[in-house]
From Swiss-Prot:
Coiled coil location: none
Protein name per UniProt: Ubiquitin carboxyl-terminal hydrolase 17-like protein 13
Any single biological process term in GO: regulation of protein stability
Skewed-composition ranges (Polar residues): 493-505
Length: 530
């Protein structure tokens, strides 16, 4: 089983990387094993937290925190729509959510990475930088996403949007690492991507016989929520951190008293991410059925109740993007998203169509993936725009905000135009393919039962159309010159998705995501008595 795979199956909360290791942890573990611990350990809960926190800075800093721009570089207004080249709505919806992620967009527009990148081809960070720059600086236009964004993933049919989202995030994480050398996992957790999307879980098992405590800390990039018995995101989070009793056949083998004993297991967030990606588990691996129930999600979410430390103030996140799947099962459907522009206005991004939306409409969707950002981060970016401190996105005083693809390409060889690049596609495909990526995932999870969802075919009455799709009638009939798919579709007659027009629902087809289960890898534990 490869360590670099994004999903290794098993318990979902430990699905990204292997456990933290260091000489300090090994030494502490060995010392605990050698000594007989009293019933109450002198180490407090705060001491254990500090010990774990100290492990991460020891890793080599591949993308120091000061590299993240401190002020916003994004234009205040909404950017471009994305052309659907046939069964690519899942790509477009995911890219729009990433494009309007403030820390990521600001880093891309600062050009920190491309100025030092030596890979030139096959670099996902450089490819995303080119895409985000074009999208944000071409409001009112429709652009074609680069083929390199989905090389090795798209196979001519609709795929799962969340899988593509995390495939892209994982590719950007790997692009932060130097070359193709093997890097330890603590160092991987210091990359730019982990700084933005990453945090740490704490899984704590307390022996009820000797009161010994085992803490395991694991990194995460997204959080999957079981919604079968939940009516809201808050309820799903409460179920996630609810203590689990281990007794009977599931009794815990304690490393302190060296016997099987009843225990209590609790999962909490040890550190919080700047940006939270919450995935609502709506699909079944076995049947492909979808839970079409409404799950409430707030505009502002307090994550403090789910943290390891409860003695601090509120930890408020604000919603800035929602990825939606419209359809009845993973075998058919259409993806679109809602994003919040820097100016604070919400927009519906449905392929080429960009329409203004109200917060009421945003919060009434059957969401698939929710994107939250810490309130302090959002306010900092918003204040810099309101004060007129927006820096030039391309780093030159007289560069036009609507930079052309040719200008970007001349600035740096990594920034490729959206036209096809056979060498880039070939290399990207060789490095990571969908089949290889999915081979690393275990398929032994069960999912919720199927419920039919009614799909509305009209836009809300309060929606203002900013610009309509130039391809609303479909490329097949009116744009024969664009029959060749941007994302390397099959030469056989493909199925083209059409952008949703006002009062018309796009074609529903394709397949959707698989749920993520819980990862039950072996754990390196730090045993402490209390």
């Amino acid at each position: 089983m490869e360590e670099d795979s994004l999903y290794l199956g098993g318990e979902w909360q430990f699905n990204h990387f292997s456990k933290l290791t260091s000489s300090r942890l090994d030494a502490a573990f060995a010392e605990i094993q050698r000594t007989s611990l009293p019933e109450k350990s002198p180490l407090s809960c705060e001491t254990r937290v500090d010990l774990c926190d100290d492990l991460v800075p020891e890793a080599r800093q591949l993308a120091p925190r000061e590299k993240l721009p401190l002020s916003s570089r994004r234009p205040a207004a909404v950017g471009a729509g994305l052309q659907n080249m046939g069964n690519t709505c899942y790509v477009n919806a995911s890219l729009q959510c990433l494009t309007y992620t403030p820390p990521l967009a600001n880093y891309m527009l600062s050009r920190e990475h491309s100025q030092t990148c030596h890979r030139h081809k096959g670099c996902m960070l450089c490819t995303m930088q080119a895409h985000i720059t074009r999208a944000l600086h071409n409001p009112g236009h429709v652009i074609q996403p680069s083929q390199a964004l989905a090389a090795g993933f798209h196979r001519g049919k609709q795929e799962d949007a969340h899988e593509f989202l995390m495939f892209t995030v994982d590719a950007m994480k790997k692009a932060c690492l130097p070359g193709h050398k093997q890097v330890d996992h603590p160092s991987k957790d210091t990359t730019l991507i982990h700084q933005i999307f990453g945090g740490y879980w704490r899984s704590q098992i307390k022996c009820l016989h000797c009161h010994g405590i085992s803490d395991t800390f694991d990194p995460y990039l997204d959080i999957a929520l079981d919604i079968q018995a939940a009516q809201s995101v808050q309820q799903a989070l409460e179920q996630l951190v609810k203590p689990e009793e281990l007794n009977g056949e599931n009794a815990y083998h304690c490393g302190v008293c060296l016997q099987r004993a009843p225990a209590s297991k609790t999962l909490t967030l040890h550190t919080s991410a700047k940006v939270l990606i919450l995935v609502l588990k709506r699909f079944s691996d076995v049947t492909g059925n979808k839970i079409a129930k409404n799950v409430q999600y707030p505009e502002c979410l307090d994550m403090q109740p789910y943290m390891s430390q409860q003695n601090t103030g509120p930890l408020v996140y604000v919603l800035y993007a929602v990825l939606v799947h419209a359809g009845w099962s993973c075998h058919n459907g259409h993806y679109f998203s809602y994003v919040k522009a820097q100016e604070g206005q919400w927009y519906k991004m449905d392929d080429a169509e960009v329409t203004a939306a109200s917060i009421t409409s945003v919060l009434s969707q059957q969401a698939y993936v929710l994107f939250y950002i810490q309130k302090s981060e959002w306010e900092r970016h918003s204040e810099s725009v309101s004060r007129g401190r927006e820096p030039r996105a391309l780093g030159a005083e007289d560069t036009d905000r609507r930079a052309t693809q040719g200008e970007l390409k001349r600035d740096h060889p990594c920034l490729q135009a959206p036209e096809l690049d056979e060498h880039l596609v070939e290399r990207a495909t060789q490095e990571s393919t969908l089949d290889r990526w999915k081979f690393l995932q275990e398929q032994n999870k069960t999912k919720p039962e199927f419920n039919v969802r009614k799909v509305e075919g009209t836009l809300p009455p309060d929606v203002l159309v900013i610009h309509q799709s130039k391809y609303k009638c479909g490329m097949k009939n009116h744009h024969p010159e664009q029959q060749s798919s941007l994302l390397n579709l099959s030469s056989s007659t493909p199925t083209h998705q059409e952008s949703m027009n006002t009062g018309t629902l796009a074609s529903l087809r394709g397949r959707a995501r698989r749920s993520k289960g819980k990862n039950k890898h072996s754990k390196r534990a730090l045993l402490v008595c209390q």
